[in-house]
Amino acid sequence: MKTLLLLVGLLLTWENGPWVLGDKAISDKELQEMSTEGSKYVNKEIKNALKEVKQIKTLIEQSNEERKSLLSSLEEAKKKKEDALNDTRDTETKLKGSQGLCNETMMALWEECKPCLKQTCMKFYARVCRSGSGLVGHQLEEFLNQSSPFYFWINGDRIDSLMENDRQQSHVMDIMEDSFNRASNIMDELFQDRFFNREPFDTQFFSPFGSSHRGSLFFNPKSRFARNIMPFPLFTDLNYHDMFQPFFDMIHQAQQAMDAHLHRIPYHFPEAGVPENSNDRAVCKEIRHNSTGCLRMKDQCEKCREILSVDCSASNSSQMQLRQELYTSLQMAEKFSKLYDQLLQSYQQKMLNTSSLLKQLNEQFSWVSQLANLTQNDDRYYLQVTTVNSHGSDPSVPSGLTKVVVKLFDSYPITLIIPQEVSDPKFMETVAEEALQQYRQRSREE
């Protein structure tokens, strides 16, 4: 009789699950229940991620509106700058027609100006720019010998500097507009879809905890975008990877398009609050390029200053009037060029902000998409618990902790040590949270 009772007890024990080192092992049914609870948490995190995606999308749209406003200001400043530059060029041409006047006086002063200008410039270069003084000295000698005092007298260096600056500004603007237009075409197609406009975000159409047939409500099946992400009958179950991968690909493409040239713009904006004449880096660059930077130092040489003050009105009264007109238009052109630089710098910053937001969008969405990419079967669990061990069943697990092995979709197994008992109501929430954190961390490292 005792033997019979013992056998009955053993059978009952086996039906309730095997015992290991005094602890009852987790049954398959309990593992399924834990997987269901963990999957609900992952589903909630996916919904939160999509809500954040929409918030970032709103910020991108706001940044784009600010960019449009800046673009309008840039176009206005560009028009004024070009008008002033045209006036400057026209007046310069007229002045060149009378450059023979006072030529003897200017040439005498120029011969005394050149040695001082060369010495002053080379001292500056050796002290500030340092590299390649010998080559620069030879280049400067040729530049001064080929230049005329008339070029000096009409501030030809300032005119040339403006023209070069205008060329670079146009080049920079072309680069930024090309990058933005490439990204904008992708973002327009991405954001115009009702997936991003539905309120509130609802992931039930791909959730294993609800009907999947609601997916068709989010897309216009006639659009190219819808055809790309719905290569299957309209009312069939949606595949997680097919749903998300196109979004991730488009966001990634938009970010790449924006960053293609934006961070390699070959132009240094003038530093805010720093006078142009004290911008040593720009002066060094000009001196190395064609020696015109040396003409910035003309005020340090007496004979050079005298050339600038030569009055030829006795020979031709209209010449001094033209020179004054040139000076006025030159000042206006420099003023609008500086304004354009400031607006261009703000525009670039706005573009960088958009690029940064696209990066956030990419990072926020990528983990969802990458998880979806791992899904190769119809398993209804986002998170699947495969093993659970405590100290009683596995002596290597410290007392009071629980060792859990899980899989997110079809990902690699993730081993977690949880500072809670299985009986804790928050146990699976902690497991799911830790699993997602580990997955995101590994994704970033890869």
Curated annotation (Swiss-Prot):
Q: Which UniProt keywords apply?
A: Chaperone, Cytoplasm, Cytoplasmic vesicle, Disulfide bond, Endoplasmic reticulum, Glycoprotein, Membrane, Microsome, Mitochondrion, Nucleus, Phosphoprotein, Secreted, Signal, Ubl conjugation
Localization, UniProt: Secreted; Nucleus; Cytoplasm; Mitochondrion membrane
Cleaved signal peptide residues? 1-28
Q: What is this protein called?
A: Clusterin
Membrane topology listed for this record: Peripheral membrane protein
Query: What molecular functions are annotated in GO for this chain?
Result: misfolded protein binding; ubiquitin protein ligase binding; unfolded protein binding
- Residues carrying covalently attached carbohydrate according to the record: N86, N103, N145, N290, N316, N353, N373
Give the record's GO biological process terms. chaperone-mediated protein folding; immune complex clearance; intrinsic apoptotic signaling pathway; negative regulation of amyloid fibril formation; negative regulation of intrinsic apoptotic signaling pathway in response to DNA damage; negative regulation of protein-containing complex assembly; positive regulation of apoptotic process; positive regulation of intrinsic apoptotic signaling pathway
Q: How does it assemble?
A: Antiparallel disulfide-linked heterodimer of an alpha chain and a beta chain. Self-associates and forms higher oligomers. Interacts with a broad range of misfolded proteins, including APP, APOC2 and LYZ. Slightly acidic pH promotes interaction with misfolded proteins. Forms high-molecular weight oligomers upon interaction with misfolded proteins. Interacts with APOA1, LRP2, CLUAP1 and PON1. Interacts with the complement membrane attack complex. Interacts (via alpha chain) with XRCC6.
Q: What InterPro entries does the entry give? A: Clusterin, Clusterin-like, Clusterin_C, Clusterin_CS, Clusterin_N
Q: How is it modified after translation?
A: Proteolytically cleaved on its way through the secretory system, probably within the Golgi lumen. Proteolytic cleavage is not necessary for its chaperone activity. All non-secreted forms are not proteolytically cleaved. Chaperone activity of uncleaved forms is dependent on a non-reducing environment. Polyubiquitinated, leading to proteasomal degradation. Under cellular stress, the intracellular level of cleaved form is reduced due to proteasomal degradation.
Pfam families assigned: Clusterin (PF01093)
Does the entry annotate any disulfide bonds, and if so which pairs? C102-C312, C113-C304, C116-C301, C121-C294, C129-C284
Would you tell me the Gene Ontology cellular component terms? Answer: chromaffin granule; cytoplasm; cytosol; extracellular space; intracellular membrane-bounded organelle; mitochondrial inner membrane; mitochondrion; nucleus
Describe the function of this protein.
Answer: Functions as extracellular chaperone that prevents aggregation of non native proteins. Prevents stress-induced aggregation of blood plasma proteins. Inhibits formation of amyloid fibrils by APP, APOC2, B2M, CALCA, CSN3, SNCA and aggregation-prone LYZ variants (in vitro). Does not require ATP. Maintains partially unfolded proteins in a state appropriate for subsequent refolding by other chaperones, such as HSPA8/HSC70. Does not refold proteins by itself.
Q: How would you summarize where this protein is expressed among tissues?
A: Highest levels in brain and liver; lower levels are detected in other tissues, including the aorta. Abundant in senescent porcine pituitary colloids.
Motif interval(s): Nuclear localization signal: 78-81, 440-444
The family assignment reads: Belongs to the clusterin family.
Residues carrying Phosphoserine:
S133
Chief location of this protein? secreted
